[in-house]
Amino acid sequence: MKRHIALIPAAGSGRRFGGKQAKQYQLIDGKPILFHTLERLNKSFFQSIYVVGKKDSFDFASFKKDYESFFPGVIFLPLGGEERSDTVQKAVFYLFQQNKVFSQDWLWVHDAVRCLIQEKWLQTLKQVVEEKNHSAILASKVTDTVKKAEPDKLVIATTIQRDDLYLAQTPQVFPAGVLAQALEGDRTGARDEAMLVEKLGQPVELVSVSYTHLTLPTSDLV
């Protein structure tokens, strides 16, 4: 049976969010954003959930100490790297080495700060990957007018047709073996895991969701 395993990279600094503390550890309603994200995923269908933070992170250690008891099935891995792709690579390779994941399993990579994920979207994404038998990601259709600037100045070069444009979101779901293969290659310039899988020539399905799933980019939104 193909299992569904969630991987949450939580080693980022969240510089765009502002403040000294990484945004996944900042509070909403008295709890860290990561807590709310885990609360959503932990109620869903996942056989295993892994949170990956930095070994020397005080915030990661404090979160584990304070909230681990709320999520007894969640496993915290101190394997975080400097970049997101480093964190995901180290975690995926570790899970394979420890026989915690196998090539046929589905690996879900979900941003720690995307705490607005809805169960209906998880279920839809699960249905799509199981029916199509290949990778898929959540994505929001671009609805704003998009302008491209000149390379060296803030002057409009052209207006981009938005009909086929989507904003990549998470979760991003992959056959574990495909993701591991993608992470073995050149990760330079890769914005997300889907981009790495694209480089392999593998199909990645888009599952359209609303803008309400977008991350929290600035501190004045909470």
Where do the PLM segments sit?
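Short aromatic/hydrophobic "clamp" motif used to bind/position activated sugar donors
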Residues: 107
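Conserved small/polar residues in nucleotide/adenosyl-binding loops
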Residues: 212-218
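Conserved core of the sugar-phosphate nucleotidyltransferase
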Residues: 116-207
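Residue-level signal for inorganic ion chemistry
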Residues: 8, 34, 91, 111, ...
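Conserved N-terminal catalytic core of the sugar/cofactor nucleotidyltransferase
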Residues: 34-104
